[in-house]
Every structure is written in structure tokens, then in C-alpha cells.
From Swiss-Prot:
Pfam families: Trypsin. Disulfide bonds join 56-72, 180-197, 206-230. This is Trypsin delta. It comes from Drosophila melanogaster (Fruit fly). It catalyses: Preferential cleavage: Arg-|-Xaa, Lys-|-Xaa. The gene is deltaTry. InterPro entries: Peptidase_S1, Peptidase_S1_PA, Peptidase_S1_PA_chymotrypsin, Peptidase_S1A, Trypsin_dom, TRYPSIN_HIS, TRYPSIN_SER.
Amino acid sequence: MLKFVILLSAVACALGGTVPEGLLPQLDGRIVGGSATTISSFPWQISLQRSGSHSCGGSIYSSNVIVTAAHCLQSVSASVLQIRAGSSYWSSGGVTFSVSSFKNHEGYNANTMVNDIAIIKINGALTFSSTIKAIGLASSNPANGAAASVSGWGTLSYGSSSIPSQLQYVNVNIVSQSQCASSTYGYGSQIRSTMICAAASGKDACQGDSGGPLVSGGVLVGVVSWGYGCAYSNYPGVYADVAALRSWVISNA
């Protein structure tokens, strides 16, 4: 289940880039304009898999807890889930662990995408190394324009159904919540208090796997959540705001 993106982009374009309130995102996911990388550069990254197939990204919080997006865990049971850590490839290498349980944020709303965060507990414990590391949670948001990176195994082009075997990443810049909701961009009131945005000129506005990490300053600042297609420069990628949701993660981990 990859990142949310509007498929009806022609509708938004016809409306001059304004997205109608309540228009629901559709499923798609990609890292466009990025580059292949290795897990040692993003050792907190994991592949969340359903029945052995890559489904979403996630970030290592502790030896047995993963942070991901709540929308990745809709209509699924823990028994069909596993994670792969420590590998640049979602289908091989590293280590795999089955999932013992997961919990979505109680305030998650699939219509508005508020509180789009979840934790996963695995059976067993990860052994930390150069390719498997936990990442800290942001306690405050980076400044508007701050450098950040997004990683994952998202598809490489719009509408593609295939995903790359090797981990990809893109460099982006933070767009603050207030800026993302301003008239500079097309989201308006759809940007809520539990969201933060990021974008980069010349790169797709909707990078990354759902649930995957947005990292700035060496800490996890966002969880890949959703975004609209059409005029990409006018629609940054939208992420769950880790600083705003930090206390929930800590109390439930």
C-alpha cells in the first residue's frame, strides 16, 4: 500500500490547482527524480511486507518497535505482516521478523489523514549494526526550507505498478505547516496540525513509500502520508508530523 496521490489530477488542474475539500486521495507511490542508495546511508529504513510482498516503508524506533503510517495498516492482520531490515533490497538480504502486533493512532481519520501514524511491534529484537540503527524522534519541527531526505522503494514513474529492487532516496526541503496551508500551495485547510510538508524543485512532489521516513538534522521529522498530483510544484508531499505526534509514539512503544 503505497503513498496516497490523486489520480484525478485533471480535475484539480481544471480548477486552477485548487483541490476540492473532501476529494479523497487514491493509492499510488513513487520516488521520482531520486537516486539508488544503500541501507548503510539510511539504516533506520525497513520494508513492511504483506504476505512477502513490499507494502510500505517504516523507521526503526527501537530494537522491537517500528514507526509507520496508520493507513498502511488498514484491513490487515498482524499474521500476514513482516519487516525486512538491514538490506538495500526489499526482497533479499538483511533480516526479517514477523509482526506480533500493531497499533494505529486512535485519532487517525482516513478521510482527512490526520494522525496518520502507527507503531509495529516485532517478534524478537533487532541487533543494531552499521545497516540497522534506530532513529530519534524530532521534538520540534525544522525550519521552513531546511534540507531533508526521503527514502523508500516507491515506484519510479507515475502509474507504474513495478517497484525498484534497490532502495531509492530524494533530497527535499521542508515546507512548514503554515506555509503548506497558505495560498502559496493548493492544499489550504486540508493541511492539519498533525501534518508537515516537503518538496523539491524539479522532483516529484509525492516522493516515497507510505510510512517511510522524512529525515532532517539526523532525526525523524515526518512519516510519508499523502499528496496530490497535477501541478507538482503547487502540491508538496504531505507527512505525518513526528514532533506533533511524538508523545503518542513514546507512550505506545
